[in-house]
Every structure is written in structure tokens, then in C-alpha cells.
């Protein structure tokens, strides 16, 4: 998941990208279907994705991990810092070639996520971040995750919260999304596939991002999307704020705590295979 593609030139970020490599011979372009690192203009969406990898990577320590839908590969590489093994699968051949060239710690293969190319009970963790909303047969995919997981293995899923991402719409606002979910729908999808102990969290803007929201008409998200759709130039203040976002600017809050899960930006579910 990422924003609509803005009509702006590519810029390299000054901070270090989240990988062991600083250059890639197979460069992915920003299409609106996936987020990529090292672009100031995409930085908000990238950090919103990256924070979930950072917070949940410890659950992959010394485990065999599958990332189903790896996209650019930065997340699989981050997990490879702690995991015993990381296998990454993506449907897009260009993305697979990019991951193979840029992230040598990751074993990557091209496949349909509805037919995962792994044996039964072969991994301890399946990671699926900002991907399930792109799939046509979500139930089949979740059953495939259950198949390849060992007993007591974890399925970790993040996805945009339908209630806040496409408010008041019958269809997703993002043209690359097939079906978006709310917290109850995601929980039911996992339970129906046989998973248990589903823990749900929500991702929210922290104080600094809430200040940015206030500076940009109430929503820094809407400020970006509005200009991207219109092909309009970004005001310097918006560009500077977007480029300054870090993962520390997001809060991950467990459902039932002091924030309503239905108000979250993204949903994060961790489910156990019996």
C-alpha cells in the first residue's frame, strides 16, 4: 500500500536506507502499488510501513520466516538481521529480480501467493504486511499461510483500516486494492482459516504527526493525496514535513487500550496456528 504516485522528480534521501547495501543495479520505480525507500516524496508511506517491521522483527528472532508479498524487499532484509532464514515471495518478476540483486541475505522466489511454493509446516513465521488488501482470494491465501506454518507458528498481517483509509466508500480508494478490511473482518478471516489467539493492534499518528496534520488542513495524508491526484506541485512546507517523518512518529496501540481500533490508520494482527 502506498499513496497515489505524485508528479515529482525522484530524490535520494540523506539518511541511511534500511539495508546492508547502498545501491541496487535493479531499481524499482514508484508506481503507486508498493512503497519504496530512499524517496523524500514517499517517505511518509515508507516510514508507516517500516515501523511495523521494526516493532515486530523481534518475534522473528532465530526463526525460519516467510515474507509473503515482499515488494521492494527492505522489510525482508530487516527481518534477516534477526531471523535464522528469510524466504521472500512476490508475484512481480521485476520486484523479485530487484530483491535478489539488492538483498543477498534474502532467499527470494516468484510465485502466486494463493499457491505458496513451500512444503507443509516449513516455517515458523509468515509475515504479510500491506499486501492482503491487494489479493483477490484472501481466504485462500490465509489458508495457505496456515499450511506452511509449523505448529504454534505466527501469522503477522498488517493492512489499511478500511474505516479510515476509504471512509464512506463501497470500494477501495486505492485502485490497486481489491478488498480492504476493518478489525472485525480481519479477525474473522484469520479465525475462519483455523488460526487462534488473534491479537489486534492499531497504528496511529503520534504527537509530531498530529502537529503536522494540524499544519496541513487537518490531514497530512489528504494533503499528499490531493496534490498527487491533481498533479499539483507540493508546497515547500508539505515536502519538508513529509521528508522529516520517522518511524518514531507512529504509535502502535493494542486493541482495547486507550484508542479505538476503528480510528486506527492500519491494522496489525498476530495470529497463532494451533
From Swiss-Prot:
Gene Ontology CC entries for this record: cytosol; plasma membrane
Similarity comment: family membership: Belongs to the methyltransferase superfamily.
GO MF annotations, alphabetized: methyltransferase activity; S-adenosylmethionine-dependent methyltransferase activity
Summary of the function given for this chain in its UniProt record: Probable S-adenosylmethionine-dependent methyltransferase required for the 6-O-methylation of the polysaccharide backbone of 6-O-methylglucosyl lipopolysaccharides (MGLP).
Swiss-Prot/TrEMBL GO biological process terms: methylation
A matching Pfam family: Methyltransf_11
Gene3D superfamilies in alphabetical order: Vaccinia Virus protein VP39 (3.40.50.150)
Enzyme Commission designation: 2.1.1.-
Keyword Transferase in annotation: yes
Keyword Membrane: no
Region annotated Disordered, chain positions: 1-24
Entry protein name: Probable S-adenosylmethionine-dependent methyltransferase Rv3030
Organism whose genome encodes this protein: Mycobacterium tuberculosis (strain ATCC 25618 / H37Rv)
Alphabetical keyword list: Methyltransferase, S-adenosyl-L-methionine, Transferase
InterPro entries referenced in this protein's UniProt entry, alphabetically: Methyltransf_11, Methyltransf_Superfamily, SAM-dependent_MTases_sf
Amino acid at each position: 500500500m502506498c499513496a497515489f504516485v505524485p508528479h515529482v522528480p525522484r530524490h535520494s534521501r540523506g539518511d541511511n536506507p534500511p539495508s546492508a547495501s547502498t545501491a541496487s543495479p535493479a531499481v524499482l520505480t514508484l508506481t503507486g502499488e508498493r512503497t519504496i525507500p530512499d524517496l523524500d516524496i514517499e517517505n511518509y508511506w515508507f516510514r508507516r510501513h517500516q515501523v511495523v517491521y521494526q516493532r515486530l522483527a523481534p518475534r522473528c528472532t532465530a526463526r525460519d520466516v516467510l515474507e509473503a508479498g515482499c515488494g521492494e524487499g527492505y522489510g525482508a532484509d530487516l527481518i534477516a538481521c534477526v531471523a535464522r532464514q528469510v524466504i521472500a515471495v512476490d508475484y512481480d518478476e521485476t520486484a523479485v529480480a530487484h530483491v535478489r540483486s539488492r538483498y543477498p541475505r534474502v532467499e527470494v522466489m516468484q510465485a502466486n501467493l494463493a499457491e505458496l511454493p513451500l512444503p507443509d509446516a516449513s516455517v515458523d513465521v509468515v509475515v504479510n504486511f500491506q499486501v492482503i488488501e491487494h489479493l483477490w482470494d484472501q481466504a485462500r491465501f490465509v489458508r495457505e499461510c496456515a499450511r506452511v506454518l509449523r505448529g504454534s507458528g505466527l501469522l503477522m498481517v498488517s493492512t489499511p483500516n478500511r474505516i479510515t483509509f476509504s471512509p464512506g466508500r463501497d470500494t477501495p480508494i486505492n485502485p490497486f486494492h481489491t478488498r480492504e478490511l476493518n478489525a472485525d473482518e480481519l479477525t474473522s478471516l484469520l479465525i475462519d482459516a483455523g488460526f487462534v489467539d488473534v491479537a489486534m493492534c492499531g497504528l496511529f499518528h503520534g504527537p509530531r504527526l498530529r502537529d503536522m496534520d494540524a499544519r496541513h488542513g487537518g490531514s497530512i495524508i489528504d494533503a499528499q493525496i490531493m496534490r498527487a491526484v491533481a498533479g499539483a506541485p507540493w508546497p515547500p512546507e508539505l515536502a519538508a514535513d513529509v521528508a522529516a517523518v520517522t518511524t518514531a512518529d507512529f504509535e502502535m496501540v493494542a486493541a482495547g487500550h486507550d484508542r479505538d481500533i476503528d480510528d486506527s490508520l492500519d491494522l496489525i494482527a498476530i495470529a497463532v496456528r494451533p
